[in-house]
């Protein structure tokens, strides 16, 4: 058995808590060796209010030297192309598409029915084209509006459009079973079963943070599983402070490390983050915790490079 250092012991104690759970978490860290869980900060950038929010978000990322993926709706990008280019054209950031106008690419129990196949083609192709035109770099990733509880499984026609557009990964698994939240800590997989082994699914995890604060004004809804796989991450009510939100985030960050997940990425929306926490205190708390745990920051594109075998680092 590999000898564990004092530094690893201290880190294990922080992650797992003091007591018997420390030993089980230490054993997990020993078993995984030098493999480190990756962390991806990702933002669904989808509304006019996102531009001001992204200015604040970028400041925090640069201060922490924290990479990020921005999934941008094409219409949102086309409304302020120069401003977004100046703000996000930075080595830390990947820019991917969030479709062109946030229309549904398959049915979603909460967000509505899918548009026609012709409309889905436009959403995929125009969204990718907008990113590549504004940023003059390849766009290899797509996150569909709202996401789904079964990703794009069983949707070969949509996957064919995605392949035709040149998209290499999608991030569409953003809900738990039966459209529940939080989304589970799922690892990447490809669509070989649908006939598309070169297209990878890179899920998102945890809550859609806007729902934690009732920013969609849905009010009380049927959202959680019972019994919950993450009871500590189901608050008694809507979050009231940045610290409340951070405590929820911490559950997923800690669990991903404890269970040896390949990565963890929470589902964030700039407009909602800024409305709730204009000083971005939650980001600072979360990024500090990521660094304390020793998670390995990256972008979705970098994760795709690893899981697809393109990048062996």
Regions found by a protein language model. Give the residues of each.
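N-terminal export signals
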Residues: 2, 8-28
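Generic structural signal for well-ordered alpha-helices
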Residues: 54, 58, 81-85, 121-128, ...
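Active-site-adjacent pocket scaffolds in enzyme catalytic domains
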Residues: 77, 146-259
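C-terminal segment of N-terminal export signals and the immediately downstream linker at the start
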Residues: 24-38
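Active-site-adjacent substrate/metal-binding segments within catalytic domains
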Residues: 41-51
